[in-house]
């Protein structure tokens, strides 16, 4: 099953301008525990910087959300 369909089946609609990220970077691993929705800009940063685990991704999301709220 397509990873986006897997995500939507479990979590509902993907927000506009958000992407689904494979946490382990393995696009064949479509287990729901390996999928996370992210704003597109955060997704780009993850792939450019090589953030590899959920903890680092969560820190990045918190920083993004904090910056969005203050701007």
Regions picked out by a protein language model, each given a short descriptive name:
Residues 1-63:
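Short, cationic Gly/His-enriched loop motifs
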């Amino acid at each position: 099953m397509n990873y986006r369909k897997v995500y939507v089946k479990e979590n509902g609609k993907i927000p506009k301008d958000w992407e689904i990220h494979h946490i382990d970077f393995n696009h064949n691993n479509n287990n729901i525990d390996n999928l996370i929705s992210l704003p597109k800009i955060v997704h780009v940063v993850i792939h450019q910087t090589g953030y590899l685990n959920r903890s680092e991704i969560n820190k990045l999301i918190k920083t993004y959300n904090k910056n969005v709220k203050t701007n």
